């Protein structure tokens, strides 16, 4: 039997028992996981049943984690309704919730049984959600090639992304995940922009100024491309292009040098770190990611200076 977990903002009816939870960055809580477990238990769900998650990336992260832990794991499917979830969050089997203020600090690998892509959901997507998704799309383009990177920038400028480009971005990420399903090596490439991005996102949540995941990732990409220029001598042109588009479409960053200590403290909690050292994915060039890059605190502060003074 199928059970549905759906973002309460979506007005779609299913012929299955449905639990509605408001999506967004605040929904990935242990309390909501318990609500899903109770819903499944109340309807006598078995290990042979499936939980279908309808919504953005936060709903699939939340529902996937609940499914992976209910009765030691039941199947789950995803109907992504945002660009972010279509192009990124619905791929790869990562699930998780935020705990004690830290992003995705509790989670599992649990691959969805099915994913249903329907781009008609994007026709009513608010601009803010489109921009949030485009940050992950651009990140994947940066990891791939100049051709893909420029295609993603054109989509951002046009305010529209084609189904062909969505499928291309999904294929790039899916290939990386296929080659490294447990994130032991090259799958960590997908964390480009996320060391600083997650710190900004966590800070926003804890300080009562939440920002969309993709906005934080876009800011993280700009700062980490700056580090790439500084540390790996990457050509500055991708940084110039991305900086211009971030200012034009995403606005300025609402932090200052007074926040550096706390932001760096968040970075120290990043799951990529080893030996208490903050680690980054940086670029030698477009399509040339480098794992396990380190930076001195002074260098991180310089990158934040660049970002915050734009």
Describe the role of every protein-language-model region.
Residues 42-45, 111-114, 120-127, 135-147, ...:
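Generic secondary-structure signature for well-ordered alpha-helical cores
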Residues 151-261:
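Active-site segments that bind and position negatively charged phosphate/pyrophosphate groups
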Residues 135-138, 234-310:
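C-terminal charged capping/lid subdomain of soluble metabolic enzymes
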Residues 1-50:
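ATP/NTP phosphate-donor binding region
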Residues 37-54, 63-78:
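Non-catalytic interfacial helical region
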